[in-house]
Swiss-Prot record:
PANTHER family: CDC68 RELATED (PTHR13980), FACT COMPLEX SUBUNIT SPT16 (PTHR13980:SF15). One of its GO terms (biological process) is constitutive heterochromatin formation. This is FACT complex subunit spt16. The keyword DNA damage applies. It comes from Aspergillus fumigatus (strain ATCC MYA-4609 / CBS 101355 / FGSC A1100 / Af293) (Neosartorya fumigata).
Length: 1019
């Protein structure tokens, strides 16, 4: 049991006292409900997630507010006895010492101890009388329940068992204020979901003539219960309503098209939703208390259907009028039957067998069914579900069609009042105007024209990009018309980027020199003199590690220097003396970026350095080492602090308490938790995911509100199947900061040599290998289904936060080097990703400002791709060494997702470029923006009109940029080697045509001919 469990002691004793008062009064009654029992046994076995609420767990919730599995309650008029485990017993301890004694008997794994507790309970039952109240219809299972049943059967032969469920039904029937509020809130949630969501979805589907099965529509309604925002917006629900406390009591069930089942056990089938009679019903539970609602909707109804629904409304009103204090339950049913016999006797056989039942913790109280035999009297404060319905009525106007048979139902949840009912579900209209829809006479609505972008994206996504070594077959030989369209589209995108940049940065001045100005951070070594260490009295140099301070004696006084003011310290020897030189930070030193820091007052006088002399060589060497170490530690702490700046503390994960969370077992986590690599399991909770490690109860929580992207990558062509979560803000996993959390399972089993296996003697050839391959394919397909289904469940649970599953398009992927190794990079709908091996790459497409293709020139086998982000302070991302065969595919994809791109023959120094952009972004866009990147590619294509470049580089600057890019860029050494090979070829004097002829000749000699392919691309 969870630690948060707190039992309301006052409520427990109030309800127990009222129960005991009714029990004592019943002993004097001429019509005993309790059957003359001297004791009552309530047995709870193993909890079953699928089981409905019955009298035994209803008793637990009514008295304790919680369900205690594997627990025995024995009630006598003198005391209550509880048999349970020690863990559960500690939650029941506060109940001791009340006005009714509560004795707790603790069981352990020791069978003898459990037997002693059971024997004591049986002795108590015997001493209370020869009749004991039990619940024979409740199905309890589990070892604890079986042990009790076996022991009781052996030791209680002379004790008579009496069904106590009518007495419990009477005790639960009249609700107190808290119970009524919970049922009212559940009812308002039902009404809101029916009228504000289901009706809208149903009418939209019918209006747009979309096909959807009952099961699929039910699943949509089912998922809506997790939408806290939806329920919080419902006007009738109070401000204190907690949307996390609602759950399904039954359903939702949606039926149409001639097949109807009005029982609570009905389920939605796989038939499509059809016009005509549509029935929808469901029940919602709030704080364990239920409410239910059902409505019949008439879509283009026939006259017969309209007439019968109007009559059903009259029946409903007639029953409702008599729902008041003092009415006999069977009179409600008889009134409806009498009205049918008077008005429409042909419908008597089609009328439902009861007009409702008691409702509360149990969805349907079997001891309070409103049929023609129930003689119980209604009392003010009772809650009922009132149901009127007609089943399998033949429509004479639709004879021969599958919709000729129809059913109708109306269900409301009500409270019995002194003078009439209080209808809790009245906000979902049931009059003819509210439930009738007419689409038949309307004109067919025009279908909206889909945007061109969507079609283009899907076309690109479904196309395979062929890779081949033959030049004439490469995608560089592209359709001229397509290239012209792409070039035109790119010009539009470039102009749009410039306009957006001017609008975005209008009135801004940018950062000074392209660097965000750092703020001066104050530091203080000591607040008072008495905080100085005692060793300063010796007037020696002292390094105070605790205060991060170096204390230097100057003119007989200890002077502290905080380590943040010190640049470095060094020791040198000269003759018999050793010299310690301490250099301080001051403005204008021309130090590197790492040491760059702001100063409070640049006009102040600064101390540049101190030199101290001593004959104690070892002492000064130690001091120099201590200062260096202190400085190193200070820088490390500062760096760690800077790294952790964007780590935001997450909210608490809200765990699912009332049912088992959906789990994905046997998955590994990346980045892994510290320690041994073992598989754990992922659980879906109310507001996030939890990865549970089997060791040390470690876990990692990921909240839906922090999920930026959710990816599912199948195991096709891969060794693993995975679900990857890319976060908005980083979290800590162990001691690592990460923005990416991945759950994966290996898709291949360990291979082993079967030599010596007896099966080998009887099977030869490739049969075993073929079977193994078939099994491997089946297993991979099953893995993909399992992980995809789990990813979709994550998306459903997190849909309020906009979580959606994205799957990479492998067919339009390309290889490249984003970090150290060559990997497959794949586009998705919203991102460009590499998820197979760490470090992962996730680039969100809508955050990209522009893409630039580097080293695009004839003779090179690969090129580089640089993404510049809309946040100019973010470093551009490089993907290097992409094969030139992928060039056209990459361009097509960039164009299809509306990313402006340019290309050029060189690697650029992006650090310098971004400093220029950030220093004056408005000026940058006013001077043409990114057009300087396109200048090279435009001239290469032979364009007559050249735009003036906003970022002109001289030859020396280009050379410098090329040199510096070797340090800045992360592509491998092949690129520069290939560039030098090309320049050597150029010097030989062979032109393009000569090179092409030689290449074709070489291809033909290898048995290949490319004469059938299209013309060469003009340069």
């Amino acid at each position: 049991m969870a630690e948060e469990i707190v039992i309301d002691k006052t409520l427990f004793f109030n309800r127990l006292s009222s129960f005991y008062a009714a029990w004592r009064a019943d002993k004097r009654s001429s019509h005993p409900t309790f059957g003359g029992v001297g004791s009552i046994v309530i047995l709870m076995g193993k909890t079953d997630e699928a089981s409905t609420f019955q009298k035994n767990n209803a008793m637990h919730f009514w008295l304790l507010g919680y369900e205690f599995p594997a627990t025995l309650l024995v009630f006598t008029l003198e005391a209550v006895y509880v048999v349970t485990t020690a863990k559960k017993a500690k939650h029941l301890e506060p109940l001791r010492g009340g006005k009714i004694p509560v004795e707790i008997l603790i069981t352990t794994k020791d069978p003898e101890g459990k037997l002693r507790s059971f024997e004591k309970c049986i002795e108590v039952i015997r001493s209370a009388g020869n009749k004991v109240g039990v619940l024979p219809k409740d199905t309890t299972t589990g070892p604890f329940a079986e042990d009790w049943k076996r022991t009781f059967a052996m030791l209680s032969a002379e004790i008579e068992e009496v069904d106590i469920s009518p007495a419990l039904s009477a005790a639960f029937a009249v609700k107190d204020t808290d119970e009524l509020v919970s049922i009212r809130n559940a009812s308002r949630a039902c009404s809101g979901l029916m009228s504000e969501y289901f009706v809208e979805e149903m009418s939209r589907l019918l209006d747009e003539e979309k096909q959807m099965t009952h099961k699929a529509l039910s699943a949509r309604v089912d998922a809506k219960i997790d939408d806290a925002k939806f329920f919080n917006k419902l006007g009738k629900l109070p401000a204190e309503f907690d949307a996390q406390q609602i759950d399904w009591a039954y359903g939702p069930v949606i039926q149409s098209g001639g097949k109807y089942d009005l029982r609570l056990t009905a389920v939605s089938d796989n038939s499509n939703l059809e016009p005509g009679i549509i029935i929808a019903g469901f029940g919602i539970r709030y704080k364990t208390y239920s409410s239910m609602i059902a409505r019949t909707y008439l879509v283009d109804p026939s006259k017969s259907q309209e007439t019968n629904y109007a009559f059903l409304l009259a029946l409903h009103e007639a029953v409702m009028r008599d729902v008041r204090d003092g009415t006999i339950a069977k009179d409600l049913y008889n009134k409806a039957i009498n009205l049918i016999r008077t008005k429409k006797p042909e419908l008597e056989s089609h009328f439902v067998k009861s007009v409702g039942a008691g409702i509360g913790i149990e969805l349907r109280d079997p001891n309070m069914v409103l049929n023609g035999k129930n003689s119980r009297t209604l009392k003010s404060g009772m809650t009922l579900s009132i149901t009127v319905g007609l089943t399998d009525v033949e429509d004479p106007e639709l004879k021969g069609s599958k919709s000729s048979t129809y059913s109708m139902i109306i269900t409301d949840t009500v409270r019995v009042g002194e003078n009439g009912p209080h209808v809790f579900t009245k906000d979902a209209g049931l009059d003819m105007d509210s439930v009738s829809f007419y689409f038949g006479d309307e004109e067919e609505p025009q279908k909206p024209i889909k945007e061109k972008k969507e079609a283009k994206t899907s076309a690109i996504a479904s196309r395979n990009i062929t890779r081949t070594k033959l030049r004439a077959e490469r995608p560089t030989q592209i359709n001229e018309g397509a290239e012209a369209r792409r070039r035109e589209h790119q010009k539009e995108l470039a102009a749009k980027k410039t306009r957006e940049g001017l609008d975005r940065f209008a009135g801004t001045t940018g950062d000074d020199n392209g660097v965000t100005q750092k703020k001066f951070k104050r530091f203080e070594s000591y607040k008072r003199d008495n905080q100085l260490p005692t060793k300063v009295r010796e007037l020696t140099i002292y390094v105070d590690q605790k205060a991060s301070t170096v204390i230097v004696p100057i003119m007989g006084r200890p002077v502290p220097f905080h380590i943040n003011t010190i640049k470095n310290a060094s020791k040198s020897d000269e003759g018999e003396y050793a010299y310690l030189r301490i250099n301080f930070l001051s403005p204008g030193q021309g130090v590197g970026r790492k040491d760059d820091q702001p100063f409070e007052d640049l006009s102040a006088h600064f101390l540049r350095n101190l030199t101290l002399r001593s004959k104690d060589n070892e002492r000064l060497a130690q001091v120099a080492q201590d200062i260096t170490e202190l400085r190193k530690n200070a820088l490390r702490r500062e760096q760690e602090k800077k790294e952790m700046e964007d780590v935001v503390e997450q909210d608490k994960l809200i765990e699912i308490r009332n049912r088992r969370p959906v789990k994905l077992p046997d998955v590994y986590l990346r980045p892994p938790l510290d320690g041994k690599r073992v598989p754990g399991e992922v659980e879906i909770h109310q507001n996030g995911l939890r990865y549970m490690s089997p060791f040390r109860n470690e876990h990692v929580d990921v909240l839906f509100s922090n999920v930026k992207h959710l990816f599912f990558q199948p195991c096709a062509h891969e060794l693993i199947v995975l679900i990857h979560v890319h976060l908005k803000t980083p979290i800590m996993i162990g001691k690592r900061k990460t923005r990416d959390v991945q759950f994966y399972r290996e898709a291949t089993e360990m291979q082993f040599d079967e030599t010596g296996n007896r099966r080998r003697k009887h099977r030869y050839g490739d049969e075993e290998e073929f079977e193994a391959e078939q099994e491997e394919r089946r297993r991979r397909a099953a893995l993909d289904r399992e992980f995809k289904a789990f990813a979709e469940k994550i998306a459903d649970a997190g849909k309020d936060e906009g979580v959606d599953v994205d799957i990479p398009f492998r067919e339009i992927g390309f290889t490249g080097v984003p970090n150290r190794s060559n990997v497959l990079i794949q586009p998705t709908t919203d991102a460009l990703v590499q998820l197979t091996e760490p470090p992962f790459l996730v680039i969100t497409l809508n955050e990209i400002e522009i893409a630039h293709l580097e080293r695009v020139q004839f003779g090179l086998k690969n090129f580089d791709l640089v993404f510049v982000f809309k946040d100019f302070h973010r470093a551009p991302v490089h993907i290097n060494t992409i094969p030139v065969e992928s060039l056209e595919g990459v361009k097509d994809w960039l164009d299809s997702v509306d990313i402006a791109f340019t290309e050029g023959p060189l690697n650029l120094n992006w650090t310098t470029i971004m400093k220029t952009v950030v220093s004056d972004p408005y000026g940058f866009f006013a001077d043409g923006g990114w057009s300087f990147l396109a200048a090279e590619s435009d001239s290469e294509d032979g364009s007559e009109e050249e735009e003036e470049s906003a970022f002109e580089l001289s030859e020396s600057e280009l050379a410098a940029a090329d040199e510096s890019s070797e340090d800045d860029s992360e592509f491998d050494d092949d690129a520069s080697a290939e560039a030098s090979d090309f320049s050597a070829e150029e010097e030989s004097g062979e032109d393009w045509d000569e090179l092409e002829r030689k290449a074709k000749k070489k291809d033909r000699e290898g048995g290949l001919d490319d004469e059938e392919h299209g013309k060469k691309r003009k340069r």
